[in-house]
A protein has these predicted regions:
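Extracytoplasmic beta-rich repeat domains
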Residues: 13, 49, 69-91, 116-139, ...
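Short loop/turn segments that connect beta-strands within beta-propeller blades
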Residues: 110-114, 155-159, 195-199, 241-244, ...
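Beta-propeller domains
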Residues: 60-70, 102-116
Length: 313
């Protein structure tokens, strides 16, 4: 029936009233797709190629790569879920590789892809949580911080435990080392400092938290006796290594980001020693001063890929 008095149209007024009460809580931002600096021409012939990286500043520099991909072997381990979304990398040694499997087992391979040792330091119930591990190598020690709030140190030659501890919240960042301390950030946007020798906590520095779990891995660098890190809501914070007190902090997003952190993505922090560079999926590419946290400039670039610094570029 086309008669609006018919029972077919009975719920029409209720629907219209319901529609009036719908509030849009997030907006879609227009993504700019264009070539950056189209007229710019670069002469890279005088760039010095170096295989050295500055790990505590995430600065890869210019690398010598011929553009060839050649398979030289394969390493077998149980398949990780969401492999396209995670940002975890193996540890490359002079004579082998270290990685982990879906149950949290740490596996060390030699150059011939042969397993040297395989160790799992989780209970049966913890294995079901499929912990994801972040690594840091320091001499004969391998430090691990995982996605189920455990952190520990193992002997890199045997895989045996040196010490093992638990945090209140899971970890979600790189691990950085400075002298006798290691630094890592958990899901509550808290930077934690631990002693290398036994894993005891030196201090922690908490920043604002978000209402949702972040979908990005937080980044850290160390410069001028400060640990500088990103968090889930886009804040960049510098903390004094010895005291754990905040030196400076730069919020890069509005307060509404607290409700939208799952969709917010930011690149790793990269420093040349004077400035810090990073970008995000909000059309923002930043350069900030490493000493003060003040903004040098912002360009419209939509990317969460790690910047690469080559010379003064």
């Amino acid at each position: 029936s086309l008669n609006e008095n018919s029972r077919i149209w009975k719920g029409k007024e209720n629907k219209l009233e319901t529609d009036k009460n719908i509030t849009k809580v997030s907006t879609e931002e227009k993504i700019i797709v264009s070539e950056f600096n189209q007229e710019l021409k670069l002469d890279l012939s005088k760039i010095q190629i170096s295989s050295k990286t500055v790990n505590n500043q995430n600065n890869l520099g210019s690398q010598n790569y011929k553009g060839e991909l050649k398979k030289i072997g394969g390493f077998k381990f149980s398949k990780l879920e969401d492999i396209d979304r995670i940002n975890f990398k193996p540890v490359f040694l002079k004579n082998g590789v270290i990685f982990f499997d879906r149950k949290g087992s740490i596996v060390k391979y030699d150059d011939n892809q042969k397993v040297i040792w395989k160790k799992n330091h989780y209970t049966k119930s913890e294995k079901k949580l499929k912990p994801k591990l972040n690594f840091l190598v320091d001499g004969k020690n391998l430090f691990v911080a995982d996605s189920i709030a455990k952190y520990y140190s193992v002997n890199i030659n045997t895989g045996e435990i040196n010490w093992i501890k638990s945090n209140i919240y899971p970890f979600n960042s790189d691990i950085k080392k400075y002298k006798d301390k290691i630094f890592v950030v958990d899901y509550k946007n808290t930077l934690r400092c631990y002693k290398i020798k036994d894993g005891s906590e030196c201090w922690n520095s908490q920043t604002d938290v978000s209402f949702t779990v972040s979908n990005i891995k937080y980044s850290l660098i160390i410069k001028n006796d400060n640990v500088i890190f990103s968090n889930s809501i886009g804040d960049i914070t510098a903390v004094d290594i010895e005291t754990g007190l905040i030196t400076w902090q730069l919020p890069t997003q509005s307060s509404s980001i607290i409700n939208e952190t799952y969709n917010f993505k930011s690149s790793r922090l990269v420093s040349d020693g004077n400035s810090i560079f990073f970008s995000n999926n909000k059309n923002e590419f930043y350069s900030i001063d490493v000493k003060t946290g003040t903004t040098n400039w912002i360009n419209e670039v939509n990317s969460n890929i790690q910047p690469i610094l080559v010379g003064n570029l």
